C-alpha cells in the first residue's frame, strides 16, 4: 500500500534565450529527475509526473550519460529505462489537470532541474497555483539545481518578473518581486560560477540572468557550497532546495525524511 503521492513537475522547454539573440539547447536533467523519483518509490510512495503541456520532459543531452551517475553505466541504464518505460514517467498529466483535481492528495511536490524551468516553469500560472497551495498548507516543496527558480511562478506577475530580469531592469525586478511567498526563506540554487561551463560548452553564449540573482532579488536568502558542484542541500520550513546535479541523492534523502515525518505526524 502506498504511503502517499509525490507530484513531480517537469519542464517542456528545449531552448533557452542567450544574450545577443538566439537560443541554446536545454531541457531537464535525467539524474535530477529519476534519482529522487526512484528513491521516493523505493521508500513506499507513488510518483505522478506533470508538465505544462502534458508531454514527457525533454532530457537535456548534457545529462544523458553515465557521468551523472558516478560513472556507473548500469545505474545510468536503469535510470534511462525507468524514465522511458515506467508508467510513473510515461503517464504524464498537464499542470492544469493537476490543479483541477484535488491537490490535497499529494504529500509533496518536487521540481528537478536542468535549465528548462528557467524557460517555462518560472512563469507558469498553473504551477504558481500549485506552489501557493503547498505553501499555504506548509506542505513539502522540494526543488533541485535550476528547479528552485520555479518558485518565482508564485509571484503576482511572474511573466513580467522574468521579462524584467531578461531586460536587466533592476527597478522593475525590485517592484515585481515584492510580496514573494518565499521571501526570507533560506535556499540554494545552481550558482553563477557553475553556470559558466554549461554556457561555454553547451550554449556557446551567456544566459540573461543568474539563478541566485533572480531568487535573491525577490527576497530569497541564497547560500551555496564552498566548492562548485559539491552536493549542498538547504531545508527551511516546508522548502527543501538542492544546489546542483550532484545534490540528487542528498535531496532525495531529505525529501523522504520529510515525507516520513509528515506521515507519522498525520
Describe the function of each predicted region.
Residues 1-137, 150-266:
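Extended, subdomain-level signal for the structured scaffold at the beginning of enzyme domains
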Residues 141:
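Conserved, well-structured core segments that form or line functional sites
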Residues 144-148:
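Short, thiol/selenol-centered motifs that function as redox-active sites or metal-ligating centers
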